[in-house]
């Protein structure tokens, strides 16, 4: 039986096995899907071992996305822009193909599942790390009016804006540089939720029709989404749908079939 996996450290929390099991039942495909906890300094060896044992593909989670990108022989455009891979495909000719579908998953969740329009909208992204870099390309493809990146270290936000400046109206800065305006979409992309915190955002950013979205899901997303509700945001979503949509795109890469994501999202929401 073909083998697939999610590789990360930690990996115990990953919902990907549950999601792929649901896709497996839905599409009548049979395969094994494993959780592989790779040593922090042993990712390449773990990938080689899995590949040598007949592995066909792997989802990649923290902290190995950049290393997975470097390991690949060929990469999709989104992976090249992000300098990170969210999944690998082990091809018949022995080469490794890297993709990054994080941004695709986000845009699919926002536009298809939640009916949020991104075209000609103002988007604020909070955080300038790898998560933000991974979503910028697909967000810019949606032709927003502008994207503003805000970060505790302004230079990181400026650097990201510079990388993508040819793709559309994009700027970066620190929290004290934020213009007093109401954004259509605010995306939280920092890891502060793991500590039960959220960034020092000023009042006045959220309008009556604003959508606030946390890339994390469950309890980790709670601090930011509670802030959004307190600020009066009309729409508040966590990143569970993004994860499912990401994995649906990976499933299509591996099997050539695009699964129905709605029942899987509903199933996970009922159990989380």
Swiss-Prot record:
Keywords: Amino-acid biosynthesis, Aromatic amino acid biosynthesis, NADP, Oxidoreductase. GO terms for molecular function: NADP binding; shikimate 3-dehydrogenase (NADP+) activity. Shikimate binds at residues 14-16, 61, 102, 217. The keyword Amino-acid biosynthesis applies. Pathway: Metabolic intermediate biosynthesis; chorismate biosynthesis; chorismate from D-erythrose 4-phosphate and phosphoenolpyruvate: step 4/7. Its EC number is 1.1.1.25. The keyword NADP applies. It comes from the Bacteria. The active site is at residue 65. NADP(+) binds at residues 127-131, 151-156, 215, 239. Pfam families: Shikimate_DH, Shikimate_dh_N. GO terms for biological process: amino acid biosynthetic process; aromatic amino acid family biosynthetic process; chorismate biosynthetic process; shikimate metabolic process. It catalyses: shikimate + NADP(+) = 3-dehydroshikimate + NADPH + H(+). GO terms for cellular component: cytosol. Belongs to the shikimate dehydrogenase family. Homodimer. Involved in the biosynthesis of the chorismate, which leads to the biosynthesis of aromatic amino acids. Catalyzes the reversible NADPH linked reduction of 3-dehydroshikimate (DHSA) to yield shikimate (SA). This is Shikimate dehydrogenase (NADP(+)). The gene is aroE.
């Amino acid at each position: 039986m073909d083998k697939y996996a999610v590789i990360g450290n930690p990996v115990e929390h990953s919902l990907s096995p549950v999601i792929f099991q649901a896709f497996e039942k839905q599409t009548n495909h049979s395969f094994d899907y494993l959780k592989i906890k790779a040593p922090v300094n042993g990712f390449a060896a773990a990938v080689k071992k899995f590949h040598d044992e007949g592995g066909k593909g792997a989802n990649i989670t923290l902290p190995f996305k950049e290393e997975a990108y470097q390991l690949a022989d060929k990469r999709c455009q989104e992976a090249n822009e992000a300098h990170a891979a969210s999944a690998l495909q082990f091809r018949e000719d022995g080469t490794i193909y890297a993709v990054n579908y994080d941004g695709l998953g986000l845009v699919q969740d926002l536009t298809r599942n939640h009916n949020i329009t991104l075209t000609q909208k103002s988007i604020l992204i909070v955080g300038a790390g790898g998560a933000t870099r991974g979503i910028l390309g697909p967000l810019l493809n949606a032709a927003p009016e502008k994207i503003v990146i805000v970060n505790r270290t302004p230079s990181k936000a400026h650097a990201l804006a510079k990388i993508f400046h040819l793709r559309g109206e994009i700027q970066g800065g620190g929290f004290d540089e934020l213009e007093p305006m109401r954004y259509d979409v605010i995306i939280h992309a920092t890891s502060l939720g793991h500590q039960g915190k959220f960034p020092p955002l000023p009042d006045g950013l959220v309008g009556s029709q604003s959508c606030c979205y946390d890339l994390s899901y469950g309890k980790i997303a709670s601090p930011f989404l509670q802030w959004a509700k307190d600020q009066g945001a009309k729409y508040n979503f966590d990143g569970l749908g993004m994860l499912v949509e990401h994995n649906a795109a990976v499933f299509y890469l591996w099997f050539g079939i695009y699964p129905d994501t709605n029942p899987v999202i509903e199933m996970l929401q009922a159990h989380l």
